[in-house]
Amino acid sequence: MQSPLTIPVPVPVLRLPRGPDGFSRGFASDGRRTILRPEVGEGHIQDPPESQEQRARATLRERYLRSLLAMVGHPVSFTLHEGVHVTAQFGATDLDVANFYVSQLQTPIGVQAEALLRCSDIISYSFKL
């Protein structure tokens, strides 16, 4: 007589933060700790240009991601290559923001119930709040 097959129980994975050397996960084996720099005001004069640029890029990325969040469920007009204009109900984007999932895509040749628009094909988009 055979014993019943048991289904293995999934084990949750804990992803540790990056170690002090920047490559490993977890903590340094010799007990080293990285020292955090104190927070500095936004308009500090001694900030290197790289950190100012990084802060500006972070602000622009946050605005872009907030605009994507605001578009969900609203009609959006897209301008594609070759001057093609389409309108659709925005649904979602993938993790890499490489594709937009839309519904009721109105194209010059008809309406598509659901579609994926590649961001590399989009020149601009607009929507009303």
From Swiss-Prot:
Localization (cell): Nucleus, Nucleoplasm; Nucleus, Gem; Cytoplasm
GO terms for biological process, alphabetical: spliceosomal snRNP assembly
GO cellular component: cytoplasm; cytosol; Gemini of Cajal bodies; nuclear body; nucleoplasm; SMN complex; SMN-Sm protein complex
Keyword Nucleus: yes
Residue stretches making up the SUZ-C domain: 1-31
Location of N-acetylmethionine modifications: M1
Superkingdom, taxonomy of origin: Eukaryota
Pfam families for this protein: Gemin7 (PF11095)
Biological role stated in the UniProt entry: The SMN complex catalyzes the assembly of small nuclear ribonucleoproteins (snRNPs), the building blocks of the spliceosome, and thereby plays an important role in the splicing of cellular pre-mRNAs. Most spliceosomal snRNPs contain a common set of Sm proteins SNRPB, SNRPD1, SNRPD2, SNRPD3, SNRPE, SNRPF and SNRPG that assemble in a heptameric protein ring on the Sm site of the small nuclear RNA to form the core snRNP (Sm core).
Name this polypeptide is given: Gem-associated protein 7
